UniProtKB/Swiss-Prot annotation:
Transit peptide endpoints, chain numbering: 1-40
Active-site residues, Swiss-Prot/TrEMBL: C150, C153
Location in the cell: Plastid, Chloroplast thylakoid membrane
GO cellular component annotations of the record: chloroplast; chloroplast thylakoid; chloroplast thylakoid membrane; plasma membrane; thylakoid lumen
Protein name: Thioredoxin-like protein HCF164, chloroplastic
Function (record text): Thiol-disulfide oxidoreductase that participates in various redox reactions in the chloroplast. Mediates the reduction of PSI-N in the thylakoid lumen. May interact and probably reduce other target proteins of the thylakoid membrane, such as FTSH2, FTSH8, LHCB5, atpA, atpB, atpE, petA and petC. Involved in the biogenesis of the plastid cytochrome b6f complex. Reducing equivalents are provided by stromal M-type thioredoxins and probably transduced through the thylakoid membrane by CCDA. Possesses low insulin disulfide bonds reducing activity.
Family note: Belongs to the thioredoxin family.
């Protein structure tokens, strides 16, 4: 938008009154028509001062806003840095406790598993009674015919050991190695053809039944329980599972006459 600028030749008298009436009189009395010294039209740009003022204002607002942003960021940084100094939350403590309990449980399971699989045929032999003593102490007896090379015998060793520990006060447990020529007569007497061969004897030494090979644990448990209770018969008098043939015997001479292995 443009504006008109008038430049008037006014009297130099300092007492001239610039009222509308005097102005009208001035224009009329000067040769009967208004005189204009100059008329020029120019755009209405903003003055440099205005621009500078706005620039100063804008710069002031910008700097103020930037100061506010910097202030807020510094507050955030200080809050984050200060939060690092806070004590750990209770959740972390709980998670650590849960992790510790889990590790302990895993170690317990690992140790118990290792203990079970750590039981060997030598351990069973070491805890077994001599055959002659078992026949003379008036208790029922479980006789296991085994061999060190028998895979099924080794697999069943942990179960046999647990059952022995449970009933050892009421039932004798005897281990006879089929590779030992000392037990040739017993091999024939009990008809051992495969191992492991478990023979169940009453208090007088009479055989009530036998189970051979890999069978469910309950077969052995229920038969031993029947012997301990003094029952006239056992639940599984004849049962055969997967076994190792006694024909694979590695016969060796007896080195210790008292040995039952």
């Amino acid at each position: 938008m443009a504006r008109l600028v008038f430049s008037l030749n006014l009297p130099s008298s300092h007492g001239f009154n610039l009222s509308p009436r005097n102005l009208q009189s001035f224009f009329v009395t000067q040769t009967g028509a208004p005189r204009f010294r100059a008329v020029r039209c120019k755009p209405n740009p903003e003055s440099s001062e205005t621009k500078q003022e706005k620039l100063v204002i804008d710069n002031g607002e910008t700097s103020s806003a930037s100061k506010e942003v910097e202030s807020s960021s510094s507050v955030a940084d200080s809050s984050s840095s200060s939060s690092s100094g806070f004590p750990e939350s209770p959740n972390k403590d709980i998670n650590r406790r849960v992790a510790a309990v889990t590790v302990i449980a895993a170690l317990s399971l690992f140790v118990s598993t290792r203990l079970d699989f750590g039981i060997s045929l030598k351990d069973l032999t070491a805890s077994a009674l001599p055959y002659e003593e078992a026949l003379s102490n008036g208790k029922p007896t479980v006789v296991e015919f085994y061999a060190d090379w028998c895979e099924v015998c080794r697999e069943l060793a942990p179960d046999v050991y647990k059952i022995e520990q449970q009933y050892k006060d009421k039932v004798n447990f005897v281990m006879l190695n089929v590779d030992n020529t000392k037990w040739e007569q017993e091999l024939d007497e009990f008809g051992v053809e495969g191992i492991p061969h478990f023979a169940f004897l009453d208090r007088e030494g009479n055989e009530e039944g036998n189970v051979v090979g890999r069978l469910p644990r309950q077969y052995l448990v229920e038969n031993v329980n029947a012997l301990a209770a003094g029952k006239q018969s056992i639940p599984y008098a004849r049962a055969v599972g997967q076994y190792s043939s006694s024909e694979s015997r590695k016969v060796h001479q007896v080195t210790d006459p008292l040995s039952h292995g």
